[in-house]
């Protein structure tokens, strides 16, 4: 198997992550739910995961990190808790449905206005469209990198424009956390949403949001918190404000291990490794007749390359890659409908190759060989 579907989830995890999860499952009690050793061990693991995430992403400290099931839930928490009824929200056509659908719900149920800044056919942001959309905005929710084409956007500039317009800025870092070197506390964002199961190499059902100190986000879910149990409503102090119920301590032990593994390697070095594979793949694709590369207009690309082979359906190409050569990729719309409208690929979709820290040059070359055999039989 040649696994090149890392943008969906990283399948090959570091052994330290596997060991951490297995160890937690045989020794942890309920985090924040007792004073016996099993409960204390679980509580320390959750705190350790907060610290590991904050250290790796250069956030605002362990207390700024609230956990959720994934980036989708984190984005729902941020949008629901920060966008006032009747407010104006801005996003871009590169956004995933984890942004678009919560915003559309706010439009339909709370009278909010949703403005979408255009993405050009080459995958780059239409800056004039973005600036026009910001007038009177309350909240901006933007993706750091397109999960379709891999285009990486100038988030510092986007956040600066939002701040000038008086809007809060929420960053969807699902595709970049752990794979692209950036400072969560230094890019101008108020909230950075991340997932654990992609480039942080943690288990599925881990993720969360890093919140700027002093920012009050209304809880999306209320319930048991382990503290202030006689209060009628959920605590409003971080990080407990955005968490309810028993934490996934087993998964968070794995997430912490993944973050520590990345810290030892260095995110900048991981990024350089992935960029090298992407460059190698793009160079190879350029020599294959009939293969079109989508996007790239932003000038920076994360570990994602989207292609199409002539007018063939992307699902057919992905099936042939998997069945004939064991190359695992993802076809279709990738839950980002407006990006496909911008690219003109609504019907065909795209074949998405996505590289990670565990991939090698041989993986890249074998995938190119398979693609060449399909395109040029």
Regions found by a protein language model. Give the residues of each.
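Pyridoxal 5′-phosphate
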Residues: 1-377
